[in-house]
């Protein structure tokens, strides 16, 4: 199996709802299945990134409820881990009522583990005098430990699969953009079918999102009233914002993710798709460009981390979309790809991530706009040069510099944001 297929298998999958609370639900479901008894308590411990992303986002199939705690309770009661990131498709009114009771009675809780810097979800479920535990680490579905009544069923020394252990990331991290483009030669008809499924899935949720009076609605209204042109940039922004609106509002429709993120999947897939269709690019070329978009998104997150203090839609998916557009028009022209990457990162590389929520659609719009603009400039031989700011000589060097900023320069950003968010919670009535 190639690096491309490892990336797709691990990071590009359908997800019903925001991927962090859904991963919490999945972990709870894993533990509850092993428990084999009626669930009495659910205790989840999560890293700052998962805590932040599940803080204010609406969870599907809950009637508008928000947060990791309802996701944990509902996932444990569903107890169908085979559904993975579509775990909440197994919810119904009866299970929701039971989950709400677990939460309101204090028998379902979520704790923050501040010292964890990677994706980490640890869920303990009790019932009938028994205790079961499931731990996910380094990926939304990467199981590293399963226990029941103190008996270890799986541990980190025996990963579920080579792909789940994310060994491919060490290889991907060292690749060049030219080498990633070379991976597109590995695509077969089955890969193209899967990529097209992602397009169709994300288009469907975008159409549902257009029924909401949220960000996508107002971008569309700006076009209708003449404030924005009715062009490919505006139509792309309406499409991506509407899809994000639907997802953040908890509408019960799956989205094809990228880099383990639904919003990143929306940008990485729909932007190159819509631009390609506008310019009558052959469908296979569009699909191959989307594959490249996924690879670039995964590559950048290998450097910055899965849940960095900076917005993944901006510095990962937006970059992937820009590269995809250049690839559609100019093929593997590395000079133009370097220009596109450097330009979009210089533009929106400092966009903060303050958790998943309705406002993410605004960042999706900004990322969409910046990706198309950067690609257009690059295709015309213009862009930000190494003489400016933290931009490097190449796409790879710029991403390395961005990684340094995210890791060292913004080390206190997440702590500060979490403090603010926790203070808000403590003052809620």
Swiss-Prot record:
Molecular function in Gene Ontology: L-cysteine desulfhydrase activity
InterPro entries from the UniProt entry: Ser_deHydtase-like_asu, UPF0597
Cysteines engaged in disulfide bonds, as pairs: none
UniProt GO BP: L-cysteine catabolic process to pyruvate
Superkingdom of source: Bacteria
Protein family according to the UniProt entry: Belongs to the UPF0597 family.
Name the record gives this protein: UPF0597 protein GSU1527
